[in-house]
């Protein structure tokens, strides 16, 4: 008699692989958001409690939308990417009041030098 059950070792390994991927993604999101907050504070003296952050991933990378408390209808969009030296770089895309502008790479402005 042969059993048609999958091996528990395979299921555990698969679950650990998925869990590792999710934890890596959450760690990257946290690290990049922290870097964005520090960059905005250091370069523009903007405190973290002045805005709300929304996160998404698209074909260009990690996108963060900032909504300031005093500008509810405007979203500011930033990408946090890595340069060839594996350092984080904050790239400002722009702002829109409708929330659905097309992304074009040539409109990006890098906030921190060295990229």
Regions found by a protein language model. Give the residues of each.
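Short extracytoplasmic
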Residues: 44-73
């Amino acid at each position: 008699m042969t059993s048609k059950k999958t091996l528990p070792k395979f299921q555990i390994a698969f679950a650990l692989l998925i869990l590792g991927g999710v934890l890596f993604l959450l760690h990257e999101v946290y690290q990049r958001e922290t870097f964005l907050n520090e960059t905005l504070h250091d370069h523009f003296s903007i405190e973290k409690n002045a805005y709300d952050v929304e996160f998404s991933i698209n074909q260009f990378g990690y996108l963060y939308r900032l909504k300031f408390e005093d500008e509810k209808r405007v979203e500011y969009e930033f990408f946090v990417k890595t340069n060839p030296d594996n350092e984080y770089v904050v790239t400002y895309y722009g702002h829109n009041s409708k929330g659905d502008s097309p992304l074009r790479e040539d409109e990006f402005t890098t906030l921190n030098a060295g990229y």
